[in-house]
Amino acid sequence: MSNEKALDAIRRIKLENDTSAGNLVDLLPIEVQKRDFDLSFLDTLSEARPRLLVQGADLADFKAKVKADPSYCMYDDFIKNSTEKFYETAPFEEPQAYPPETVDKASLWRPYWRQMYVDCQMAMNATRNLSIAGIVNEDDALIAKAKAWTLKLATYDPEGVTSRGYNDEAAFRVIAAMAWGYDWLNAHFTDEEREIVKNALITRLDEIMHHLKVTVDLLNNPLNSHGVRSISSAIIPTCIALYHDHPKAGEYIAYALEYYAVHYPPWGGEDGGWAEGPDYWNTQTAFLGEAFDLLKAYCGVDMFNKTFYENTGDFPLYCMPVHSKRASFCDQSSIGDFPGLKLAYNIKHYAGVNQKPEYVWYYNQLKARDTEAHTKFYNFGWWDFGYDDLRFNILWDAPEEQAPSNDPLLKVFPITGWAAFHNKMTEREEHIHMVFKCSPFGSISHSHGDQNAFTLHAFGETLASVTGYYGGFGVDMHTKWRRHTFSKNLPLFGGKGQYGENKNTKFEGHQDRFCIEAGGNITDYDTESDIKMVEGDATASYKFFVPEIESYKRKVWFVQGKVFVMQDKATLSEEKDMTWLMHTTFTNEVADKSFTIRGENAHLDVNFINESADNITSVKNVEGFGEVDPYEFKDLEVHRHVEVEFKASKEHNILTLLVPNKNKGEQIEVSHKLVGNTLELTVDGETATIEL
């Protein structure tokens, strides 16, 4: 394949991914809270520079405070940790295209894609940080270095490999880097240099805006997650830098504000939940938070004026728990790791915005633990924590830390269909939690076919977990394992699961609307009683591949903060066998009617406690990732799951008792008695009654 054909092939793949999620505004399962937006401020914006973060009118005062106290706003850490490393680094040459022989398989070209955007992230960090340091320190040598980076980036071909249409992650970073250089160094460019950078910015800006307004029509297709992110990461900083210099800058800012005021967040409701899961909450929040900060600093507008922003820090607090790995849902580049440091910074940001002390606790927990954050690609390829500290301290103040409750609790995000049970939330070795998902967004975009799925963590280990690895969007592990119901803690009916296809799976006849039509709903919950409960209805989720299904609901009770009871009820118009799945990274010990997941420090006993146990035909331990190319998990641990087969029936009513215990020490003692629809459960001598 020639280089030009390879470039075109990647552009076609990129466009296919870009237009994923289709025009689905008629199917949006939530109503976005709308806010009026007043654009009159555009008529009075200052021409002074800088504008990005520190304002021209405030620059002298900021310099004086830093000179008097280098630790002011953690500026000294910003220099030491984020800027000095670029003092002797020469500006990078333009990246090369992916090797032609890789373009036919995502798992082959994804490493080159990732390395390219990581390099562009380094270029952005260098350009921005050296620009700030040079101006604040009044250091001509640093200013010269920052100029060199800015001018080098301006030579990158805007239609080449760092264009939005080839690698948008690289494109966003390149344009943002130049925007910082153009703004902070403006007075230090010659007229010719300034024009070169300005023209490069405008060319790239217009490409992105054409994509938003024409290719994906974002205002009518608000679910296009990369389109959304291009506003915060590229459009807003660039238009602030170009304001008064480019006649369309104001128009583009108005477009961005209309999107945020009227159409955002399409993935989250007023409850603060986020349908795409905590990793994509993380990336969206990171770029959005910075963009809103830059708008606050330059334009004086408060974009955090929706109920969603008041509550959304609760989502990672409860659904990406501090102490667990593999315990949440949707696409996750961090799968297999504890919640990352950027998540901590994002929740701290909302601590500043909303003065919520529990968020500071979460931040402090992650900050203390993640001492090697700089070694992980999803950090160094994306974030700069020294800059984050500087920005936060210039604009916000955080309250004093306060730990969340250690009592048994259930937090529900009913609009987006997420829930989380917790007990002893602040004690790592005692913490028990279950994260549950039944989302009306179905499997669209970065969501999966996993409505009514759960994970269970106890005593330091996620025993019932999500399995597999992250290799990038569209690789085998993504399209043949992670997106599908058979990789989740869920049932299959006649061997079939929920609709989890997308354009990358190459499923014949796929339409993106099928993904949302396969949504579920949290239909009932009780957060107040001693026994906490949540119920999800995932009937529609299975309908595409199991048209005979008439109803499928899963109900979970949390008893005394120690054990879980789960009921799966399904009715079908024809008899179908049912395969009840539970996945783990640990060892399974199977028996005729039960099984145990055995971790290093804890275990989970799973027993089927009603008459459904008589319908079990087999309990099997299975290893592997189905049809995933073994190349993608070479030298990585192969995970396991249990398949419990129930004989064919028109009705399935599976009642399961899940009891986590430590491997050593005192054990939770549980007994039960089932009479009709009443379950009497005795846990460590205390009796509780559940009406099924």
What label would you give each PLM region?
Residues 2-76:
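Mature N-terminal, pre-catalytic/accessory segment of carbohydrate-active enzymes
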Residues 48, 170, 174, 231, ...:
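Residues that flank catalytic or metal-binding motifs in active/ligand-binding sites
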Residues 58, 423-425, 438-442, 491, ...:
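Short, flexible loop/turn elements at secondary-structure junctions
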Residues 60-124, 136:
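N-terminal carbohydrate-binding/catalytic regions of secreted carbohydrate-active enzymes
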Residues 72-75, 113-326, 332-333:
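Aromatic-lined, polymer-binding surfaces characteristic
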Residues 216-219, 242, 280-463, 525-527, ...:
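Carbohydrate-active enzyme catalytic cores, enriched for enzymes
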Residues 464-469:
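Catalytic Cys-His active-site segments of thiol-dependent hydrolases/isopeptidases
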Residues 470-692:
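CBM-like, beta-strand-rich accessory domains located in the C-terminal region of large
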